[in-house]
Amino acid sequence: MTKMTTEEAFVKVLQMHGIENAFGIIGSAFMPISDLFPKAGITFWDVAHESNGGLIADGYTRSTGKIAMCIAQNGPGVTGLVTPIKTAYWNHTPMLLVTPQAANKTMGQGGFQEVEQMNLFKDMVCYQEEVRDPSRMAEVLNRVIEKSIRGSAPAQINVPRDYWTQVIDIELPPIVRLERSAGGVSAVTEAAKLLSNAKFPVILSGAGVVLGNAIEDCKKIAEKLDAPVCSGYQHNDSFPGSHPLAVGPLGYNGSKAAMELISKADVVLALGTRLNPFSTLPGYGIDYWPKKASIIQVDINSDRIGLTK
């Protein structure tokens, strides 16, 4: 066990996970920790509005593949992160959302800028946890970051402001990084059979292809099947547009060629996509989603499998 302050423990966990950039606006509820950022190699990017910080964090992670942190002052500042956090959630962007909270001693008594911050984000994050004891600061933060990475979505840590500057005995927690699991034998066998017998297979590539570093794998299977590749809404980066089999994005502001081609598919291989409405509902008067095709869906979130027919 080592003695250190709660903010030192917090920063050490950030370093363990390689978090080097934070975006947002820092208020009095987070100032003790921000003083440690420069020496820890963490760059804080101040913005004019909290929403900008969240949107930049989303864009940063989507373009670099590195998880970032967004911060705002408790109460009204945190409410400014609602739009970017929900956006990141639907974009499958892992992100650490840090929400300083009113002091634990005054919670429920109308503490300084007290807001139900956990309820505010409960349907916008894949995981959320409030620090209930200063000695558990590192443990909770480590778990929240891991959940964000595993769930490929924002995760929230809520920290009462009076938990900073406390000296604690602590042992830094280990990082337990789960390996990406393969599909079940029977499911993969059935998928292979469907693709082998397909007369006109079409691939739909989504965010998971990018996040899973699987663009080259997607290219290989497309070339093996000689299958055109459509990209999901907002995920043009999931397949190189210069490739001969690339036909563009589906749905809103999408490619008519992509819509016409996928409408003829007898098997659709949906890779790394939750099959959201913007990639499946009619566009430009074209009801393109193939009603009779077999759908092979591969996605990190099992709750989304089979949700869209």
List the model feature ranges, each with a label.
Residues 1-309:
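N-terminal alpha/beta PP-like core and its mobile active-site loop of ThDP/TPP-dependent enzymes
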